[in-house]
Amino acid sequence: MKHFLRMLIQVCLYFYCKFLWRCLKFVMRKLTGRCELQRICYNTKPGASRTMKIETSLRDSKSKLLQTSVSVHPDAIEKTIEDIMELKKINPDVNPQLGISLQACLLQIVGYRNLIADVEKLRREPYDSDNPQHEEMLLKLWKFLKPNTPLESRISKQWCEIGFQGDDPKTDFRGMGLLGLYNLQYFAERDATAAQQVLSDSLHPKCSKFSKAEWEKKRMDKAIGYSFAIVGINITDLAYNLLVSGALKTHFYNIAPEAPTLSHFQQTFCYLMHEFHKFWIEEDPMDIMEFNRVREKFRKRIIKQLQNPDMALCPHFAASEGLINM
């Protein structure tokens, strides 16, 4: 009974607050002569702050046109803006900047949704050793990470040298599908020097090679190693969940002036790999069993950063050269 009453109170509060909000919007329109979309565009700077407010306003609108505008095809955005202006009785000749601002916001909103679909498609596609394209990508990954060491055979224990668990990497891609391979190859190719350095650092000796006394004295270079490829796939999972949950909207809306693309997502992965590697060293774990603890602490730190509407995960490395700040 208590649970039912609590739920009833929450529902009542929701509708009460919604009613008050609609009343406030009505009053503001009468006082300013502007609709909510106009007030947001004129009073909020470009970037995540503006786009997220526009997205909320469109999604929560009573109008079906506004509700569906966040999921239209990119080619229909311009026509959708015209329909919104007509619905709101806004003269585009008197308010020329409004249409431009709304279009920029919708490009980001629709682009983010499409990016999720593109990333999800890669995640759901399993690695197929009979697919020449998949095999070529995998062999390129080795070449980029170990340019001076030939791979003796496709099935080889050498794969463990770059952090796979066995002699055939395809089994390690089951969780993230092709997305994990795409990200690893992107990092290894676009930021080869850094990727090779991170790989080298990940091969640090384990603490078992030292006595307890020696380990306590060795403060500067004692970081526990980790499996580079496996961690890369794990960080891919982190990036994927940040994307799907909407946490990355802040970042993408601040760095992509139009629609965020797969390249933006891969650049974000590179940034997360860099930052996780530094964070791992800072945390100074005693053994690899602490990976989940370190990873969760890192996830919370990234999410906290992304809660700042002005936040952009600004990477400073080769793979980020294509980023355009707003």
UniProtKB/Swiss-Prot annotation:
PROSITE patterns named in the record: ELMO (PS51335)
Source taxon at top rank: Eukaryota
InterPro entries linked to this entry: ELMO_dom, ELMO_domain-containing
Keyword vocabulary terms for this entry: GTPase activation
Every ELMO domain range: 133-306
Pfam family, one: ELMO_CED12
GO molecular function: GTPase activator activity
Keyword Chloroplast found: no
Role summary: Acts as a GTPase-activating protein (GAP) toward guanine nucleotide exchange factors like ARL2, ARL3, ARF1 and ARF6, but not for GTPases outside the Arf family.
Record protein name field: ELMO domain-containing protein 1
Organism, as annotated: Pongo abelii
Gene symbol of the encoding locus: ELMOD1
